């Protein structure tokens, strides 16, 4: 079976080789681990954001940046495009922010292929029937500071690899790379909701594509988190090819999949998060979904469309 860590490492090698042009920095820790700063103490770049997103997806998706003219009638917004032939593995087996990395006073949300070694969380890998067995671990961290050896030692231990085979990429939410990679979760938001909220077998999703605008960079981490989530909730558009079985209600799946189908829909995410006392667990899981969904049922040939791009709320969130 394909290894998300080995595929991601190929992209990491490109980033290390082109670090100067990508405006990122590469540090080798004393334990041999490699830490790649993509926005903490460096500027990062659009290309770095594109590659970072591809690493998050375990190297099993094509990632691009474009400026489509049809999202807003008033102006064009730079957007992230995703397409994958391995939707369950690339989005839930790699990209999902499913590892809370906590060592001493360091805390970060971990995404990327190393999760498939540490099985974070185990239930996800049971659902998709996947586990990586590589001897290298590649993890991306959404954090405002860089990890030390104690953190990479912990990652190595959890992944059962040597510290010198650990590669960690770091980007704050309030950075350009951070903004790009969160919009790059547009397809994953849909597969996540299918599995976690709608309890649909995501292994039936055979191919997927999506696009979402890149939120403006905001130095305030909480406001940045709000804007980046809104980019997908109000501006993300996705297309899923599903091989259904007799009895699957794909029409209902499509109708319940967009963010607008959730109870908490209707306000910028920052306002919702604030009302929830900044507690993610108080927020309806169904809100974390793309704005618009199209599903092609490969068994029947039917196509279902639901949801819509909410330009008004998107512009309000972005301050435009």
UniProtKB/Swiss-Prot annotation:
Annotated metabolic or biological route of this protein: One-carbon metabolism; methanogenesis from CO(2); 5,10-methenyl-5,6,7,8-tetrahydromethanopterin from CO(2): step 3/3
A Pfam family this chain is assigned to: MCH
Subcellular location, principal: cytoplasm
GO terms assigned for molecular function: coenzyme F420-dependent N5,N10-methenyltetrahydromethanopterin reductase activity; methenyltetrahydromethanopterin cyclohydrolase activity
Catalytic activity: 5,10-methenyl-5,6,7,8-tetrahydromethanopterin + H2O = N(5)-formyl-5,6,7,8-tetrahydromethanopterin + H(+)
InterPro entries: METHMP_CycHdrlase
GO CC terms in record: cytoplasm
Superkingdom assignment: Archaea
TM helices/strands, residue ranges: none
Family of this protein: Belongs to the MCH family.
Role noted for this protein: Catalyzes the reversible interconversion of 5-formyl-H(4)MPT to methenyl-H(4)MPT(+).
Subunit structure: Homodimer.
Name recorded for this polypeptide: Methenyltetrahydromethanopterin cyclohydrolase
Organism encoding this protein: Methanothermobacter marburgensis (strain ATCC BAA-927 / DSM 2133 / JCM 14651 / NBRC 100331 / OCM 82 / Marburg)
